Amino acid sequence: MKSASYMIGFSLLLFWLSGCNEKSNVVNISTLPKATGQVVMDTNYIQIQPAWKGIEFSNPKNIKIGYDYILYVTEPDNDRIIMVDLAGTVLGHSQYVKRPVAITEDRRFNLIIACEYDTTVGGTTVTVAAIAKIRLFNYDHNISAAPVEIVYHESPQEHITRDGSGNLITGREFTGVAVLADNDYYITRSGNNNTSPVDPDNMILHLDKNDNPYPGDYIQFVPSLDPTGTGYKSIVMLSGITTFNSRQYGTDFITTQTDPNKSYFKVVWFTYSQGSELSAPSWNSRFSLDPTNLPDILSNIFVTPQAVMVDDRSNIYVIDGSLDSLMKFDLNGKLLHESFGPSKSGNALLHPSGITYFNKIVYISDTGHNRILRYELSTDLK
């Protein structure tokens, strides 16, 4: 077992405005143009038919189109990954992987999965947060034949206990995973015990391509992080993370959080500053923090953002599971009119929890309806 020794923590002020009528920075998504029907303001999203359903999906959660141009779907309730081609045909299922909640693929065609793992301590079986890899290249992309290898997991002392509704009581859980250009990857971790100054439950771990944590960088990040905060650097109740396909943004990442005690800063793009003789290294928001001109993406617009992704132009897409909405932003955090909610999509989404993008098409894991939906801009229709 490798111990968790690298952390990216976050903290800041919270502005709780729910229940207030004056929300100067709030963007009302209900006023945006419809996503289906007539074309409004030049562009809107049109659903591609048919929806992918009836092909074995059961509460699909996270989805990812990998560098092999194949869609991967996590099914936590069925303890498996489903492999689907871009025509909607199921190509296979993984071997058993316990409660997979997030997935990505590196450039070596390794699937990297945030999941759980059962281990035995003193004759008692306990469950811990884990990272699994499926090395597709070594098995000719036959996902059914490729073994599920646990490459990293939490200590048994941090084992998971949940209540009857599945909510975490004690222990740590991994909630997201995102790969970098050099095949390193980040893991988002959440938990309720955050009193430790060096190893709180709320962290973002950084592992190299061979699944080793980065202890050397650990010291650099500590001064600017606060895993219990409520500001733009906080990482309470992390739900997802994404990185960028190019080296232009280096180690940058975007996180989503579902903390109900937080109205602002639920989706933040972080970039690393090396510091100077007068300032310590730190993670900072790439978006403007000017309170008089706060970008839409940092405003009081989200309830439970579940997943985030970026396209080739660095447009940012966020799925909100409570609002049943897709929100699209430009790289400066401005909400774009292609965004849509229930009234604009004909109630197409129900508790969506995953999103991915390929070749101008947006794929959404419509969890409540047990299906995958695809959307294309009206201007891109052939």
What are the roles of these predicted feature ranges?
Residues W16-G19:
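C-terminal motif of bacterial Sec signal peptides marking the signal peptidase cleavage site
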Residues L349-K382:
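Blade-level signature of beta-propeller repeat domains, shared across WD40, Kelch, NHL, RCC1
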Residues I70-Y72, N110-I113, D184-T188, Y249-T255, ...:
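Conserved beta-propeller blade signature
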Residues Q49-D79:
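Beta-strand-rich domains and repeat architectures in extracellular enzymes and scaffolds
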Residues V84-T89, R135-H141, D208-N212, T271-S276, ...:
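Short loop/turn segments that connect beta-strands within beta-propeller blades
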Residues V27-P60, P291-T292:
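A short helix->beta-strand "capping" segment at the edge of beta-propeller domains
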Residues N78-R80, Y117-G123, G191-S196, T258-S263, ...:
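Short glycine/acidic-enriched loop and turn motifs that connect beta-strands
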Residues I55-G66, V97-D106, I160-L180, D226-Y249, ...:
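Beta-rich, blade/repeat-based domains predominating
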